[in-house]
UniProtKB/Swiss-Prot annotation:
It comes from Xylella fastidiosa (strain 9a5c). GO terms for cellular component: cytosol; membrane. Its main location: cytoplasm. It comes from the Bacteria. Disulfide bonds: none annotated. It is found in: Cytoplasm. The gene is infC. Monomer. It holds the Pfam family IF3_C. Belongs to the IF-3 family. This is Translation initiation factor IF-3. Keywords: Cytoplasm, Initiation factor, Protein biosynthesis. IF-3 binds to the 30S ribosomal subunit and shifts the equilibrium between 70S ribosomes and their 50S and 30S subunits in favor of the free subunits, thus enhancing the availability of 30S subunits on which protein synthesis initiation begins. GO terms for biological process: ribosome disassembly. GO terms for molecular function: ribosome binding; translation initiation factor activity.
Length: 180
């Protein structure tokens, strides 16, 4: 049970120094030059002599490839690359705004301003126009509201789905126009 703390090698965790349990490793020196296949102890001694760590780079290779480097700096660089990749990917969210056929002008302007902000941030907006009671017999008011929203947003948006009736509400989806 003494070897319970052996770290398994997935892409997120690189083994270093005494965590490496294979007898022979292919070593790359701190200058990037291929040193060759050495025993684990020889490779560790070489790394300690330079005051650096022995880090397992490719555990699936035969024998595993290890590099003599500063492990802290290596982890920092990996974290930096991961953060850059994460920054470049933007998750598109769907924001939802609810209207009524009789929404007052002030409320309408606030919702329109919020909708523009969501679209500028790159999010899609789902517009719900909810009908209550006898309003269902006046669906043209909902269509007029949808047309008004479309006109007020102008050419900044793409209408992904035209207004359609789903139960007691009219639904419409808009997305920001791609800037070229």
């Amino acid at each position: 049970m003494g070897d319970c703390n052996i770290s398994t090698s997935d892409n997120k965790q690189n083994r270093k120094n005494h965590e490496i349990r294979v007898p022979r490793v292919r070593v790359i020196g701190s200058d990037g030059e291929m040193v060759g296949v050495l025993s684990r102890d020889e490779a560790l001694a070489m790394a300690e002599k330079e005051g650096l760590d022995l880090v397992e780079i490719q555990p699936q290779a035969d024998p595993p490839v290890c590099k003599v480097m500063n492990f802290g700096k290596f982890k920092f660089e990996q974290q930096k690359k991961a953060n850059e990749a994460k920054k470049k990917t933007k998750q598109v969210e769907i924001k939802e705004l609810k209207f009524r056929p009789v929404t007052d002008e002030g409320d309408y302007q606030i919702k329109l301003r919020n909708m523009r902000r969501f679209l500028e941030e790159g999010d899609k907006v789902k517009i719900n126009i909810r009908f209550r009671g006898r309003e269902m017999s006046h669906q043209e008011l909902g269509r007029q509201m949808a047309t008004r929203i479309e006109m007020d947003l102008g050419d900044d948006v793409v209408i992904e789905s035209r207004p359609r009736l789903e139960g007691r509400q009219m639904v419409m989806m808009v997305a920001p126009r791609k800037k070229s």
